From Swiss-Prot:
Name assigned to this protein: SAR-endolysin
GO molecular function annotation: lysozyme activity
Topology in membrane: Single-pass type II membrane protein
Family annotation (InterPro entries): Bacteriophage_GH24 (IPR051018), Endolysin_T4_type (IPR034690), Glyco_hydro_24 (IPR002196), Lysozyme-like_dom_sf (IPR023346), Lysozyme_dom_sf (IPR023347), SAR_endolysin-like (IPR043688)
Transmembrane regions listed in the UniProt entry: 8-28
Gene name of the encoded protein: 15
Catalyzed reaction equations: Hydrolysis of (1->4)-beta-linkages between N-acetylmuramic acid and N-acetyl-D-glucosamine residues in a peptidoglycan and between N-acetyl-D-glucosamine residues in chitodextrins
Keywords for the protein's UniProt record, in alphabetical order: Antimicrobial, Bacteriolytic enzyme, Cytolysis, Glycosidase, Host cell inner membrane, Host cell lysis by virus, Host cell membrane, Host membrane, Hydrolase, Membrane, Signal-anchor, Transmembrane, Transmembrane helix, Viral release from host cell
Catalytic residues (positions): 35, 44
Matching HAMAP family: ENDOLYSIN_T4, SAR_ENDOLYSIN
SUPFAM superfamilies in alphabetical order: Lysozyme-like
Length: 165
C-alpha cells in the first residue's frame, strides 16, 4: 500500500468504518484510491454504467458532468447503503479496521455476493484472518483476472488485518 494511503487510512480510523472505506476508495487526494474517479459516466469493464468513485445505478445521468461534491455525496450514500445491507449478516464483533475494508469490498462486488461468501462465513466463525485472506480470491471481473483488482484486494486485506496484529 502506498505510504500516503496508509497514512490517510490511519487518520480515518477515528471516523469509523465508513470513513475508512471512503478513504480506501477515494485515496488521500480524492482521486488516487482504489476506485479512481470519473466525473463523466462511462461503462466499466463488465459494461455497467458507472460514475464518480464507482457509483452505479439507474440514477446516473448520461451526458452529465458530475461535481466533486456530487461524487462525495453519492459515495457517502452508497457506503451507508452498504453498511445497512451487510451489518445484519455480521454476527460477531469486528474492529472498524476490518469492517471498513469489508465495506470497500462490498461496494465493489455487491452485497449479494458478500452474503453468500466464504468470507462472511469465516467472519461469523471468528476466523478474521481467514476472512481477510479470502479477499484475495475476488480478483476476477467478466471471467478475467485483473491486476487492478489484485492490487485492490491486497490493500483491503492489509487494512482488514490491522486489528489482528
Amino acid at each position: 500500500m502506498p505510504p500516503s494511503l496508509r497514512k490517510a487510512v490511519a487518520a480515518a480510523i477515528g471516523g469509523g468504518a465508513i470513513a475508512i472505506a471512503s478513504v480506501l476508495i477515494t485515496g488521500p487526494s480524492g482521486n488516487d484510491g482504489l476506485e479512481g474517479v470519473s466525473y463523466i459516466p462511462y461503462k466499466d469493464i463488465v459494461g455497467v454504467w458507472t460514475v464518480c468513485h464507482g457509483h452505479t445505478g439507474k440514477d446516473i445521468m448520461l451526458g452529465k458532468t458530475y461535481t466533486k461534491a456530487e461524487c462525495k455525496a453519492l459515495l457517502n450514500k452508497d457506503l451507508a447503503t452498504v453498511a445497512r445491507q451487510i451489518n445484519p449478516y455480521i454476527k460477531v464483533d469486528i474492529p472498524e479496521t476490518t469492517r471498513g475494508p469489508l465495506y470497500s469490498f462490498v461496494y465493489n462486488v455487491g452485497a449479494g455476493n458478500f452474503r453468500t461468501s466464504t468470507l462472511l462465513r469465516k467472519i461469523n466463525q471468528g476466523d478474521i484472518k481467514g476472512a481477510c485472506d479470502q479477499l484475495r480470491r475476488w480478483t476476477y471481473a467478466g471471467g478475467k483476472q485483473w491486476k487492478g483488482l489484485m492490487t485492490r484486494r491486497e490493500i483491503e486485506r492489509e487494512v482488514c488485518l490491522w486489528g489482528q496484529q
